[in-house]
A protein has these predicted regions:
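Membrane-inserting effector segments that mediate pore formation, membrane fusion
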Residues: 24-61, 65-120
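Juxtamembrane loop-helix boundary motifs flanking transmembrane segments in multi-pass membrane proteins
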Residues: 8, 12, 16, 63-67, ...
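Residue-level signal for secondary-structure boundary elements
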Residues: 2-5, 32, 36, 130, ...
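Hydrophobic alpha-helical transmembrane segments of membrane transport and translocation systems
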Residues: 119-148
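C-terminal end of P-loop GTPase domains and the immediately downstream helical coupling element
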Residues: 1-25
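Charged, alpha-helix-enriched surfaces in structured cytosolic catalytic cores
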Residues: 19, 113, 134
Length: 148
C-alpha cells in the first residue's frame, strides 16, 4: 500500500505502470478462476464487480480521483460495439460450459483474457495517457485475439 501511495502522489510513471501491471495480472488470474465455475452466467456479477474494481484501482494508481462515475464513463467510452462484442463473448462463454470440463476451462480462459484486455486498456488510458480512440482500438484488437 505504501508503494501505491508513493507512486500515486509523485506521479512516478514507472512505479504507476508497475503497480497497475501487478493489479492487472492479479485480477486477470482471479477472474480466470472465477470463470471456471460450471454454472452458466452465475459468475457474471462477480466478474463485473472485479473488473470494475480493477479499473477503479488503476485509476487510483494514476493519481486521479476515483469514483463510480469516472469508471463508468471509461467503460462506456470504450464503445457500444466493444460492449456488444463483450456481451456476445459472455454468451458464448456461458453456452460452452455445457461441454464437460473443457467448457469450463475455455470459459475461465475467456474470463481471464477479457479482464486482461480491459485492464490493458485502462492502463493505456489512465497511466500511459493514450488517446481514447487509440485505447478503443487496443481494447477491440485484444478482444478479437481471444476466440474460444
Amino acid at each position: 500500500e505504501a508503494q501505491l501511495e508513493f507512486a500515486r502522489f509523485t506521479a512516478a510513471r514507472r512505479a504507476q505502470a508497475f503497480i497497475a501491471s501487478q493489479l492487472l495480472k492479479s485480477f486477470s488470474a482471479v477472474c480466470g478462476v472465477v470463470g471456471l465455475q460450471p454454472i452458466p452466467l452465475a459468475d457474471l456479477p462477480v466478474l463485473l464487480a472485479l473488473q470494475s474494481l480493477m479499473v477503479g484501482l488503476i485509476v487510483h494508481t494514476s493519481g486521479r480521483p476515483v469514483g463510480p462515475r469516472l469508471v463508468g464513463e471509461f467503460l462506456a467510452a470504450l464503445g457500444i460495439n466493444a460492449a456488444a462484442g463483450f456481451a456476445l463473448r459472455e454468451g458464448a462463454r456461458a453456452a460452452i460450459r455445457f461441454v464437460p470440463f473443457w467448457g469450463s476451462a475455455v470459459s475461465g480462459f475467456v474470463a481471464g483474457a477479457g479482464t486482461y484486455a480491459l485492464g490493458r486498456a485502462a492502463i493505456a488510458y489512465f497511466i500511459d495517457d493514450t488517446p481514447l480512440e487509440e485505447t478503443r482500438r487496443l481494447f477491440r484488437k485484444m478482444l478479437r485475439r481471444q476466440n474460444p
